Amino acid sequence: MISLFKKLYFTFSRSSRIIITLVIIDQLTKWWFINNLRWKPGLMLKVTSILNMVYTWNYGISFGLMREYYQYSNAIFLITNMIIVCYLYHLMICSKTIGSFVGYNFVIGGAIGNLIDRFCRGAVFDFIHFHYRNYSFPVFNLADCFITLGVIILIEDYFSTKKVIEETSKENFDNLQIEAMAAKIRNTDHVSNDKI
């Protein structure tokens, strides 16, 4: 029982530092853009030929989806996001690899960053806008980057872990076959010796 508490404390303290750092980075960048640039919604700052900084409030979910239901759904978004964060935290505590631990931390940190916006401001502040020729990617923020990076880490971890498990299983299966053949040979030798 004590070892379980030690594991939970160790996991909580490590993950808390990562998550809090990501949330602080996200909230500081949003605060800086909102307060120092004194933009108005719709204005844009061209950074490069493919990157703009824009002032946008996202009243929907990721990438502005479902924003037309904002009046009815902000409370639902908040509750749903809190439930998802709690579930992801549970998965992170149960994670067996460093990759999944880090991936869940990034997803949780990004989700909490956006959750703070929705709770304190009623919407999520987005400011990063990539575009190329006629293609325009939806406006996003650093919390969205953290979530995306976390999902990529989790996917990579899943496939690399799956590969290791498959290789280990095949190796174990091959070893079992060799042991079975050796036992069969020993039994055959034993029977042959009995006949002599």
UniProtKB/Swiss-Prot annotation:
InterPro entries: Peptidase_A8. GO terms for cellular component: plasma membrane. Keywords: Aspartyl protease, Cell inner membrane, Cell membrane, Hydrolase, Membrane, Protease, Transmembrane, Transmembrane helix. It is found in: Cell inner membrane. This protein specifically catalyzes the removal of signal peptides from prolipoproteins. HAMAP family: LspA. This is Lipoprotein signal peptidase. It comes from Rickettsia typhi (strain ATCC VR-144 / Wilmington).
